[in-house]
Structures are given as structure tokens and as C-alpha cells.
Amino acid sequence: MNKLSRQNKIKQIIRSKHIGTQEELKHQLELEKVFVTQATLSRDMRELGLFKSRDKEGYLYYEIPENGSTIFTPAALYYIKKVFRTDALLVFHTNLGEADVLANLIDSESHSEILGTVAGADTLLVICKNEEIASQLESDVLSNL
């Protein structure tokens, strides 16, 4: 199973059940015939931006963040260190080796405002539909850094 399919399965499980630990999530994935290492699961959870909430009985469980003022997930924002814009293009700077991870996160969300991404080692080019969208996304990212 590829990464995108696996992460979509994780989202499906998190949305349908109260999962309180990584071990519970790993078990639910195995019931779905998806086998992952603890390291892979941990990385997927970080990239998806999962966070813990408490229900009325005080039980902690994982949730998927809802996008607020930006289309980018908390996981994507985690990787962005600097942002620059020119016309309809955004340039995101990341730590070395993280630009491709950020590209995968952005591409997997399939936002209509973004035409595509091109990743280097620590730089990501984001091609937006137009200059207005690029400007708005730049502002959103800057306000969330």
C-alpha cells in the first residue's frame, strides 16, 4: 500500500473510532490488512497533524485537524521555515531533506488553488492558479508560522 492510501486509511479510522494510542491505531490498521512499523505510523501521524482531544468522560483520543484560516495542514506548516512570493509562485524553504515531504503533503490534499509543486532538497516551488491566490496563501502561511 502506498503512503497516500495508507494515510487515507488512517484518516478513515480516526474519523470513525475514538483511537487513544498509536498501538490502538496500529491494531486497527492491521485489522484492515495494513501493516506498518511504529516509525512509519508515527511519521504518518505527524504528517497528518493528528492531535489528542478529550471527550466528555475524559478519554483522550486522536483527531484530525480541521483547516482554519489556511488550506495548509498543521503538518505542512511544521515544515515551512520561510516563504517568498513572486507573481503566482510561492517558494517555501524547509530544513534539508524535507521539501519533498512538504510537497507530498500539499499534493495529497489536491487543492484547486494549487496547480502543482516542484521540490528540491530544502526548497519547494508551489505553483498557484493566479497571483491573488498566491498572495492569500503567502499571507496565510506567514500568519501561521
Swiss-Prot record:
Localisation per UniProt entry: Cytoplasm
SUPFAM superfamilies documented for this protein: C-terminal domain of arginine repressor, Winged helix' DNA-binding domain
Descriptive protein name: Arginine repressor
Pathway membership, UniProt: Amino-acid biosynthesis; L-arginine biosynthesis [regulation]
Any one GO BP annotation for this protein: protein complex oligomerization
Family from the record: Belongs to the ArgR family.
Gene encoding the protein: argR
Molecular-function GO term, any one: DNA-binding transcription factor activity
GO CC field: cytoplasm
Entry keyword annotation includes Repressor: yes
NCBIfam families for this protein: argR_whole
Main location group: cytoplasm
Role description: Regulates arginine biosynthesis genes.
Highest taxon listed in the record's lineage: Bacteria
Keyword list, A-Z: Amino-acid biosynthesis, Arginine biosynthesis, Cytoplasm, DNA-binding, Repressor, Transcription, Transcription regulation
